[in-house]
C-alpha cells in the first residue's frame, strides 16, 4: 500500500495535469525540476551512467585485452523519450444521452398509448398533437379488436363491389374543330377567345350535386355573352391593326351550349362539360356555322343519353326498393319463425325443468326420510346406553355404600381402642396453635411499644430542647421500627427535610418570637403597600401612642388579629394561631412570614407524630 501511494503521488506530480495546477501547489518555477530529481523511499534507484562498479572477487583478477567487451552504440545512445500520455477515455455522453432519450421516448409513448386507450379526452389530445400518436393508437386498437374477435379475418364471404363497366373514349374519336386551313392566315398562337375557352368552360361548369336546371341555363347564357363580347373585342382589335386588309365578314351567331335538364349524375356532368368545351372551341372559329347541324345532333344524343341514365337510375332505385321489401318480408318471416322456435324451446325447457323439479323433490324427500329414520335409531340407541350407564352407576353406588358401612364398623372398633390417642393429638395441636398465635401477639405488641417509645423520644427531643435541635436519629429509629408500614412511611415523607435536619422551635420559643414579631407588626400596621420612608417614620411614631384594645370577634384589623393570635398561643392552639396570622395583609403579612414558616414546620411534625401514634394504637387494636 505504501509503495503504491508513493508511486501514484509521484506520477501525479509528473503528469500533464500537474502543470495546470503548478501555481497552486508549487509557487516557484523550478519546483517541478527538483521534484523530478528526487527519489522516494518506495522507488528503485536508477542506474547512474559512469558510476564506479563495486569490485567483486572475480573482477579483481586480470582480464586480457581481447576479452574486454567493446561499448555498443546502443549503450551510448540517449535514453528513449517517455511514452506519450494515455489518451483521455471517452465518456460516451452522446451514447448515454441517446440511450436515455430512446428509453424516455419509449416510456412516454407507452404511457401515452395506455392513457389514450383508457381516456377519450387524452385520446383526442394524443392523436392530434403527438407525432405518430394516431398510428400507434390505431395499431394497438386493431390488435385489441383482433384479440377480442379472432374470427374477423376468417370466412369473409362478401359480395364483390359492382363498380360498373368503365367507359373509355378514344383520343381521336368525336368531332374536331379543325376542318380546313384558315384562308385569312390568322395566328392562332395569339391571345384571344380561343385561348381561354377552357377557362370559360370551367367557370361555367358547376358542381354536379349542387347545380339546378335554372342555374345551369343561366351559366350557359352567361358563358355565351362573355364569349360573344370577347370575340367582338378581338374583331375590333384586328380591324384596328389590319386597316389595309379587307373588311372582315360579319360575326357568326355563336353555337349554344348543351344542357341536360336532369344531369345531376357525375358521368353526365363530365360529358356535358367536355361537350361544352368542344362547343366553345368550335364557336371560337369563324366557320362555326358549318358544324351547327352536327352539334345539334350531338346535343340531342346527349339529351337521349341523360334520359337513359335517368331511366336506368330509376329502374335501379325501383329494383332496390323491391329488394328491400323482399328483405323486410324475409326478416318478418324469420322473426316469426324465431319467436315460434323460442316459444317451443321455452315450453320444452319448462317441461324439462318441471320434470327435474319433481325428481329432485322426490330425492330430497327420500333423503330427509332416511335422515329422520337414522336420527330415531340413534336416539333409541342413546336411550338404551343411558339406561345401561344408570344401572352401572347404581351398582357402583351400592358397592360404595357397602364399603362405607364396613369402614364405619372398623372405625368404631378402632375408636374404642385409640380414642385417647386422638384426643391427646388434638390437644397437642391446639396447644401449638395457641402458642404460635400468642407469640405473634407478643411480637406485635413489642414492636408497637418500641414504636411508641421512639415517637415519645422524638416528642421529648422537640419539647425539652431550649434551642432547635436536629432529630434525624430518632426519626430513623421510628422508620426502622415501622418497616413495611405505608402509613408511617407516608407520614415521615410528609415532614420537610429542613425540619428534622435543623430542628424546630418549641412552643415557648414560638410564643416569645411572636411577641417580638407582634411589636414589629404594630409598627408597620399603618403602612400602605407602596409606603416610603416618611410613611415608615409616621407609622413608627403613631404606633407608640396607639392604645391597646380588646380583641373583637370578626374584626380584621391588625391589633385584633394580634390579640386573638396571642390568646390562642397561650392556650396552646398553634393551628388556629397560624390561621389568624395568615389573614394579615400588606407589610404585616410580610413581617410575619418567617414566623408562619416556623409554625407550619412545627405543625407538620406534630401532625406526623400524631399519625404515627394513631397507627400504633390501631395495630394494637387489630392484635386484640
Curated annotation (Swiss-Prot):
Residues 295-440 form a coiled coil. One of its GO terms (cellular component) is MICOS complex. Its main location: mitochondrion. Residues 42-89, 156-250 are annotated as: Disordered. Residues 62-87 have a biased composition (Pro residues). Residues 1-41 form a transit peptide. The keyword Coiled coil applies. Residues 212-246 have a biased composition (Basic and acidic residues). The keyword Amino-acid biosynthesis does not apply. It is found in: Mitochondrion inner membrane. Residues 118-624 are mitochondrial intermembrane. Residues 42-96 are mitochondrial matrix. It is a single-pass membrane protein. Keywords: Coiled coil, Membrane, Mitochondrion, Mitochondrion inner membrane, Transit peptide, Transmembrane, Transmembrane helix. InterPro entries: MIC60 (IPR019133). Residues 46-61 have a biased composition (Low complexity). The chain crosses the membrane at residues 97-117. One of its GO terms (biological process) is cristae formation. It comes from the Eukaryota. Component of the MICOS complex, a large protein complex of the mitochondrial inner membrane that plays crucial roles in the maintenance of crista junctions, inner membrane architecture, and formation of contact sites to the outer membrane. Plays a role in keeping cristae membranes connected to the inner boundary membrane. Also promotes protein import via the mitochondrial intermembrane space assembly (MIA) pathway. Component of the mitochondrial contact site and cristae organizing system (MICOS) complex. Belongs to the MICOS complex subunit Mic60 family. This is MICOS complex subunit MIC60. It comes from Neosartorya fischeri (strain ATCC 1020 / DSM 3700 / CBS 544.65 / FGSC A1164 / JCM 1740 / NRRL 181 / WB 181).
